[in-house]
């Protein structure tokens, strides 16, 4: 699991990362300053951006690092990205709201809690 996107929504995924790692699943945050980073076809990338700014700023450099080889789940409040061809997202989760960072972060926390709980019940119960 690779988490990428805006700094604010990424900060609320720290508990998710910690929990997934404690369950034996690698979960890392992508950092653009890591020049040797390459995405793999076995990666699941969650790209988090409320408005889409983080995506428009990073899309070219991410594609150069092989982003489109991965399975990409885009989570955004910006409805225009639901069918945006240049993203190469496999799935788009339209998070309800209108570019409200606090509301977006709470919904992201809830979505990642559900993913974590689903993973736990599937592999540990």
Identify the meaning behind each predicted range.
Residues 1-124:
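Glycine-rich phosphate-binding loops that contact phosphosugars or nucleotide phosphates
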